[in-house]
Amino acid sequence: MAVEQFAESRSLWLKITAWEKAVVVHEVAKLAKPKLVLEIGAYVGYSAMNIARAVRPHGGRVVSLEVDPMHVTIVRNMVEYAGVSDHVDVWTGYCYDVIPHLLDIYGPHSIGMVFMDQKGTRFHTDLQLMEELGLLADGAVVLADNVLKPGAPLYIWHLMHGPYRNCTSVSVREFLLQSEDWMVMGFHDASLPPVAPPPTQLNRVAFESDAFRKRSMFDSVAPSKSDWWAFSQRFVDGLERSGCKPPVVGLHGRDNPVIKPEDIAGIFRSAGRLPPPPPQGTA
């Protein structure tokens, strides 16, 4: 995409889900075939355009939420310029105010995919709101970015101990950086019981995640690469001690993880959402 090329040509890091992250988002949307996708955190519209291209062939629609009015204006112009505005609606406001309107407009069990790219320590609360409103279709796929950096431990707990199956962490490179990040996904199963309360130590990990996120917003106190690496180790250790470290796919080398479309297809097969591949040598 032009947004990605612009950033690469200037070595300018942008908060966009590019490189392997773009592959994950596109493949999940393409394989899930949702009629309605909810994106939380539009930024400049990069992911909204990516998802729209994936769901357009089967008539899917994207509702993208953004709290910043300036970014909303940018996204609306970007999707128009990209030729996908007929498949994308951009709404302004906070999740707890805006999400209930989805029920009024689209009805219950209407959301087939959720992509979350807002504040990581809010992933689980926004997801719980959708559950309480009955917005998620059975089998809806939920995907979130930046789950390792700056981290969303309570979201992982929610997927592994709540009404979801096949929680999987996809290891990817951060755009224009060589650092590892996780995108974590799962499939909604309404027959499972509500999530149990997380252990206290996981709340402490979430507190530290939020502190690192706030530090990263200011150059004078931004974490160094070694700070991030040490925090990532503590993050993973905290998940393991809490019994909620999901299986990881896509990590084909710690310093240069590469995700491939077949990795995403494998997750969908494990969840029973795709048939098994034909035997080798079969036409």
Q: What are the residue ranges of the model-derived segments?
A:
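Class I SAM-dependent methyltransferase "Motif I" SAM/SAH-binding loop
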Residues: 41-45
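Conserved SAM-binding motif I beta-strand of class I
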Residues: 59-66
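Glycine-rich phosphate-binding loop signature in dinucleotide/nucleotide-binding domains
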Residues: 32-33, 104-110, 136-137
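Conserved SAM-dependent methyltransferase scaffold
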Residues: 48-52
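S-adenosyl-L-methionine
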Residues: 68-113, 121
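Short helix-capping segments at alpha-helix termini
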Residues: 57-58, 81-85, 134-136, 164
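C-terminal substrate-binding/active-site "lid" region of AdoMet-derived donor-dependent transferases
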Residues: 122-282
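Class I SAM-dependent transferase core
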Residues: 1-36
